[in-house]
């Protein structure tokens, strides 16, 4: 089997409807639109969300909440994640190299879930109090940048 020999299974694809190509085609003259009426006209039909004049659902439901434009998204790493990485130094460059971060502009926060056994030097944007004490107890250093 080669890529240039691939074919669709028989009956897997329908042929395109050719509209308005003579009455014997079955889709000539009115081209499947019927006679007159809103949907027979050019640009005919109702807009999305129109419910026949009834107040549409998007107007019946209340507005809720807002999007905070100044919020900061942090990449969350637990102590168990740091243990799995097996690095002596945790910073933006090492995490990008290990493909934990996409780029160096991402913000990092270390959380205290799990345990850490060896000393690690951590240089991140935020650290929880439990994570900080656990890292320092294991002989590591924490620097918030």
Curated annotation (Swiss-Prot):
Region (Disordered): 1-54
Disulphides: none
An annotated Gene Ontology molecular function: rRNA binding
Pfam families reported in the protein's UniProt record: Ribosomal_L27A
Gene Ontology CC entries for this record: cytosolic large ribosomal subunit
Cytoplasm keyword on record: no
Gene3D superfamilies in the cross-refs: 3.100.10.10
Keyword Iron-sulfur found: no
InterPro entries: Ribosomal_uL15, Ribosomal_uL15/eL18, Ribosomal_uL15/eL18_sf, Ribosomal_uL15_bac-type, Ribosomal_uL15_CS
Keywords attached to this entry: Ribonucleoprotein, Ribosomal protein, RNA-binding, rRNA-binding
Subunit structure as annotated in this protein's UniProt entry: Part of the 50S ribosomal subunit.
Family: Belongs to the universal ribosomal protein uL15 family.
Function comment: Binds to the 23S rRNA.
Protein name: Large ribosomal subunit protein uL15
Species per Swiss-Prot/TrEMBL record: Spiroplasma kunkelii
